[in-house]
Amino acid sequence: MSVSAVELASLAAGPDAVRRLGARRGFLGETPANRELARILRDRPETFGSVHSLVLGADEVHVPDLAASRGFAPSLQVFGLECIDGFQRLRILSDALAGLGAEHLEKATVRLEIHCGRYRDVARSLHDAGHRLVNATTAQDGLIRCPNVRWLMAGDWEKEGFFDPRRGVSAGPHRRCFSMPEVTRGLACLSLAPGPEALHLATTDEGIERLWGAVGSELYLGVFRDRMSPLGVVRAVEAYDSARAALRNLPGRLKKGAGHLIDYAPDLICWKACRRLLPLEDLHVEAGSRHDWGGMIEDQLPAVTARTAEDLVRRYEAVHRARGDGPHYKGEAELLDVWREVLG
C-alpha cells in the first residue's frame, strides 16, 4: 500500500525509536545513502517512495469497517509495531518533519508492507539476509544512462562487431565483442585531454570504476565525448593494443633499472606514443577520413612506441634519481605524480 510520508514521520521520533521499533541498527547519520535520501525528500518529495518499500511487522492490524467508510480505509490500527526494514528512511522522515514541516512531507508517499503472524518471521528472515539476495550495483551499471554512451550504442556496429556497456550482456553471433573496460582504456589512451589522468585511473579495476562513476565530469567527458563513432572506438582499441604489444615485444635488457617503467607504467608510454603519431582530433571521423588509420596503427605505431619508451625511460631515470626513493621502482612508477614528472 502507499501511505503519506507525513503519517509515518513520527514513528522514528525520539531517542528510543530504534529500541521501540526493534530495528536491526540505529540511525547511521550522514552516510552517502542517507544524504541522498534526504536530498531527494527535500528537492523531489514526490519521488521519495519510488524505490524500495518500508517493511514493518505487527502483532495485530485492525482494519476499520470498510462499509462504513464507503470502501476506503482512512487509517489502520497497528499494535506491536516492528521495523523490519527501512529505519533509515523513517528517521529521515522524522528529521524532515521537524525541518521541512508537515506540508512538505504531504507531497511524498511511501510504499508500505505490514506483515503479521508467520509471514512476519518470513519477512524478517528474508530482509536480514537481504544483502545476500541482491546483486550489488556498480558504477558500470550507470553507464547506460549516459547520453554519449547511448549515442555510441546506437551507432552502426554491423561492420565493427558488438558493443554494450552493461555487465552480463553476451555478444551473440557477432564477429567481435568490445568490452567496456577495453573500450574505456582505448578511448582514455587517445583522449584529447592534456594529461594522462583518465588513463591512469583506468589502469586498475578500482580506478576504472571511479572513472565510470564520474559521469558528466570533465575527466569522464574527456574519454566519453559526444558523438563518438563505432569506427573511432575500434581505432582506439586497436591503437592501445598495438602500443601495448610493442612494449611486450621489447627485449628484456631494456626493462632493467629505470627501464622498469616499461613494465610498471606501460600505459604512460602508450599514451605518449599515440599523441606523437595519431591525429586524435579525427578519431571518430568515419566517412572521408584524411588519414590512413590502419597503416599508422599497424605499421608505424609499434616503432613510435619503442622510441617513446626509450625517451621516457631516460626521463624516468632522472626523475627517480631526483626523488631519491632508492632502488624500488614498482610503487613509484605507478604514481600519477611520477607520470607527470616524467612527461615534464
Positions of PLM-derived features:
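Hydrophobic alpha-helical segments
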Residues: T47-V55, V63
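C-terminal catalytic or substrate-handling cores of phosphate/nucleotide-
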Residues: A38, R42, E106-A108, L112-L280
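Short His-Asn-centered micro-motif
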Residues: L56-G57, C83-F87, H115-C116
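Short helix/loop capping segments that flank catalytic or ligand/cofactor-binding pockets
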Residues: P64-L66, R91-L93, V122-A123
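Short active-site loop/helix that positions an aromatic residue
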Residues: V78-L81, F87-H104
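Short, well-ordered loop/turn elements at secondary-structure boundaries
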Residues: F48-V51, L76-F79, E106-T109
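A short acidic-Thr-Gly-centered motif at the start of a beta-strand
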Residues: A67-Q77, C274
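N-terminal extension/subdomain marker
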Residues: M1-F48, A73, L81, L268, ...
